[in-house]
């Protein structure tokens, strides 16, 4: 169902409850609104097709400023049974045709624990059978991708990490036309686009012509992303129960188009890939949703840009306030996630991943280009992305676990000191919530310590 209510309240039948933007999120003040509006107006100029000049280059994430390739090691899959990865992919350009994507790039959501439903007549998800401990497991997970050429669905599901990201191409192996055609055939055989019709595009012979679509806009966008793009992912472990509302939201989204009368019409402003990915995560209370297809003025405040959403999630899962339970109560999505799933988004295992475009590459330009939406004077999003991708706490699993172990220990130590000094006080109006919160912190600390012990006991292996 669309999250398209013009009110601060958006209903999703898939999540089966109302999402309310908190007062802080809904009204951050006139100054913030003006800054966001200014940034939006700047984006109009850039997205409108201007050349890659000095101004435009200021909005790019540059490979010289960041770690080119970082990925969680093999231990990660054994420690975390379920996670979501929100990925921003850079702009692509074909060497053969000269065609390329828009400056904002692309967004994709990878879900460990959700698998493609091969029995469905159009793209749908189901729970994976069992818990995967290896990326090679066929029941590991699925990549969900929105494409502007889709007509009767909003997204498709590509099964398996290897097909979603490297396209089954080994590091250092040359991407040739033959390897491209092999992946094309694999996509057809796996039924990734079963039941999907497309908006007509130049050169297409029909609205179901799959090979034309794959060659023009499928491979490098919906699957085999590294054939054509560099990819940045924010990986966030989730509770098992959180998979259900995410899957339900996405299935409902496709069902509305596949079984309803309306066609899906992609919009950079009002209904793009990032809107779907963000709102799928909002269905599980990871953060607040964004409205789609509201009035034009309202939509300015609901823009979604792949790189921005990557940074937003990265900031939430690495730097959110978990020290004060009262702050958690003031934030609607965090409060709901805590009470419903016994889960907070700032947590151990929250890591950033960077994957470069394949090189050597006969088919696509390997020049890096990824746009962020921001003020040209402050450049906050670009700088924040560079900082996070350069911080060992958020790219290295062992460092990450030790960081959160210290953080949890400090919270508990401070609580012990406060409890001793307030021993004569019988409690506060938040007494029950406080108890739940500190029980949660104890459990998280014990989980981190268990993970560190398990890593020590694991045989040494190379990175995946």
Describe these PLM feature segments:
Residues 2, 24, 30-31:
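Secretory targeting signals
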Residues 4-7, 16-19:
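Intrinsic-disorder-associated, low-complexity terminal segments enriched in Asp/Asn/His/Tyr and depleted
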Residues 30-41:
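N-terminal secretory signal peptides and thylakoid transit peptides that target proteins
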Residues 51-71, 195-464:
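Activation targets extended, charge/polar-rich intrinsically disordered C-terminal tails
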Residues 55-180:
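Intrinsically disordered, low-complexity N-terminal segments that are enriched in acidic
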Residues 142-225:
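Low-complexity, serine/threonine/proline-enriched polar segments
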């Amino acid at each position: 169902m669309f999250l398209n209510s013009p009110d601060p309240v958006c209903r999703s039948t898939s999540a089966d409850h109302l999402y309310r933007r908190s007062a802080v999120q809904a009204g951050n003040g006139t100054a913030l609104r003006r800054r966001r509006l200014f940034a939006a107006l700047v984006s109009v100029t850039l997205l409108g097709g201007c050349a890659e000049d000095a101004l435009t280059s200021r909005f790019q994430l540059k490979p010289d400023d960041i770690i080119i390739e970082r990925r969680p090691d093999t231990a990660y899959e054994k420690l975390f049974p379920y996670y979501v990865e929100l990925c921003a992919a850079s702009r692509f350009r074909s060497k053969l045709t000269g065609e390329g994507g828009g400056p904002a790039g692309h967004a994709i959501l990878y879900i460990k624990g959700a698998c493609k439903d091969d029995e469905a007549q159009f793209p749908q998800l189901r729970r994976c059978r069992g818990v995967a401990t290896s990326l090679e497991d066929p029941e590991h997970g699925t990549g969900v991708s929105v494409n502007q050429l889709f007509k009767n669905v909003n997204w498709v599901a590509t099964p398996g990490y290897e097909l979603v990201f490297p396209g089954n191409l080994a590091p250092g192996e040359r991407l040739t036309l033959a390897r491209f055609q092999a992946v094309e055939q694999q996509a057809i055989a796996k039924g990734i686009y079963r039941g999907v019709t497309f908006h007509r595009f130049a050169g297409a012979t029909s609205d179901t012509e799959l090979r034309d679509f794959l060659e023009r806009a499928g491979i490098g966008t919906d699957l085999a992303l590294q054939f054509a793009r560099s990819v940045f992912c924010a990986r966030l472990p989730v509770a098992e129960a959180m998979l259900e509302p995410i899957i339900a939201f996405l299935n409902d989204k496709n069902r509305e188009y596949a079984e309803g009368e309306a066609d899906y019409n992609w919009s950079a402003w009002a209904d793009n890939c990032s809107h779907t990915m963000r709102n799928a995560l909002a269905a599980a209370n990871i953060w607040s949703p964004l409205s789609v297809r509201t009035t034009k003025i309202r939509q300015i405040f609901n823009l979604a840009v792949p790189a921005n959403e990557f940074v937003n999630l990265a900031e939430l899962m690495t730097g959110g306030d978990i020290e004060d339970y009262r702050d958690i109560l003031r934030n609607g999505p965090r409060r709901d996630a805590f009470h419903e799933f016994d889960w907070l988004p700032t947590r151990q295992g929250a890591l950033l991943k960077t994957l470069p475009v394949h090189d050597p590459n006969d088919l696509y330009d390997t020049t890096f280009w990824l746009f962020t939406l921001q003020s040209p004077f402050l450049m906050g999003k670009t700088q924040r992305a560079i900082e996070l991708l350069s911080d060992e706490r958020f790219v290295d699993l062992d460092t990450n676990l030790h960081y959160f172990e210290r953080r949890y220990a400090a919270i508990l130590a401070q609580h012990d000191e406060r409890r001793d000094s307030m021993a004569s006080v019988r409690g506060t109006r938040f007494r029950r919530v406080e108890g739940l919160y500190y029980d949660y912190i104890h459990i998280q600390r014990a989980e981190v310590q268990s993970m560190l012990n398990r890593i020590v006991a694991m045989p040494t292996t190379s990175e995946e």
